[in-house]
Design a protein with these regions (language model features):
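N-terminal secretory signal peptides that target proteins for export/translocation
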Residues: 1-10
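Short stretches within intrinsically disordered, low-complexity N-terminal or propeptide regions
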Residues: 9-12, 32
Length: 386
């Protein structure tokens, strides 16, 4: 049915995975695999595995921390095999449409229960925003169906952060995809998926069985997406986050959408990089605006452990809490593109008020950190927050 196995929806799933999908590592010149091998295959010992917040509905899966470590090993295998002797690319979201400057402005008139963390008072923060395709292929044509990513790094955010090895970082990251739900919940299921992806053709054929019917359906829906302009697309966090601290904490999800309903048409004969061209055209000729939204959970039936089920807006509406303003700019330069690849995004680059929730997010902590370090080491590149 498909001419190319990597275009098959079931295979593309592996390129979407949140544990390294939404993570954005940094790359420079590659070191040899032999040089780095002695430091590989184990997550950072500096990072503790997250505990579960039972009050917000979190629960640890059996052997979750072990599965997390094994998933990190499988993702590292994927990177080392694909990028042996070359520049270590991201395991997924390898193709950026651009890293652009933005201003995140927190609004004054927002519900009192949402005024927590960086949303606690009206203020503006500079930010970097990276738009990307979900695939692990950096040369994959934009016209092919794919997940589309948006990673926001908010700068100059005071306060101690959650990552033990970067507590004084001045950044707060938000990671989003243009689909509201993820395709897997259980750590064991995801590990099975990664082993199938790293296996032979027979193993790859087992991917739909690893995901199950619902997971395969979600993955297919996510990876068939085609868009005209990254700035005219809506994005979701897919997984939940804590908002606030102590007795005032709650579970929420995030979304970012354009300020207007304007939609460009996809070119009749799009070239392979038409999304970068659309981004350049928009910001060369004017500014752009997007809205940052928070969706508070309204019922405990909205599980923080079930990232495969959407919190329906009819039951839990989103509230606008901030705007992202993109001033006219030139971003497609060698220096800025390199800077973009040297950025690393993680949902755990966060204030305690924005702690990630759920199994997907818990596993992301160590996996993102491990894969980021592997890539930096392979590329002999410094690893630090801007």
């Amino acid at each position: 049915m498909h001419k190319n196995s990597s275009a098959h929806p079931a295979y593309t799933i592996g390129k979407l995975v949140c544990f390294s999908t939404l993570v954005i590592g940094c790359y420079s010149h590659a070191a040899t695999t032999q040089t780095i091998a002695q430091n590989s295959m184990t997550p950072s010992p500096m990072l503790s595995y997250p505990t579960a917040d039972a009050q917000l509905g979190e629960r640890l899966y059996p052997n979750e921390a072990m599965y997390s470590q094994q998933i990190g090993v499988e993702l590292e295998k994927l990177i080392r095999k694909r990028d042996a002797g070359g520049v270590a690319q991201r395991d997924v979201h390898a193709k950026a449409h651009g890293c652009v400057k933005a201003q995140l402005t927190i609004l004054d008139q927002i519900p009192a229960n949402l005024k927590k963390g960086i949303f606690s008072r009206p203020q503006s923060y500079p930010a970097w925003v990276r738009f990307s395709n979900g695939s692990h292929h950096p040369e994959r044509p934009d016209k092919k169906g794919d997940a589309r990513g948006m990673a926001i790094k908010v700068m100059n955010v005071p306060g101690q952060k959650l990552l033990e090895d970067e507590p004084q970082a001045s950044t707060q990251d938000f990671i989003l995809i243009n689909h509201p739900v993820f395709f897997a919940n259980e750590p064991e299921r995801y590990l099975s998926l990664m082993k199938d992806i790293n296996g032979n053709l027979l193993k790859k054929a087992m991917i739909p069985f690893a995901l199950g019917f619902k997971g395969t359906k979600i993955a297919f829906q996510t990876t068939r997406s085609k868009i005209a302009n990254p700035l005219q697309t809506r994005y979701w966090s897919m997984v939940p986050y804590q908002l606030g601290l102590d007795a005032n904490r709650s579970a929420v999800k995030y979304s970012v959408r354009p300020c207007t309903a304007q939609q460009d048409a996809i070119p009749k004969h799009p070239d392979d990089n038409y999304l970068r061209a659309a981004l350049k055209n928009t910001l060369s000729n004017g500014s752009a605006c997007m809205e940052f939204l928070i969706q508070p959970r309204t019922s405990n039936a909205m599980s923080v452990e079930d990232s495969m089920t959407e919190w329906k807006e009819s039951d839990a509406p989103f509230y606008k809490v901030a705007t992202l303003q993109f001033a006219p700019q030139t971003f497609d330069t060698t220096a800025q593109n390199q800077m973009c690849e040297n950025l690393s995004f993680s949902p755990w680059h966060a204030l305690p008020e924005h702690r990630p929730l759920g199994a997907t997010n818990r596993m992301r902590k160590g996996i993102y950190d491990h894969i980021s370090k592997v890539r930096h080491e392979m590329n002999v590149a410094p690893r630090q927050e801007p």
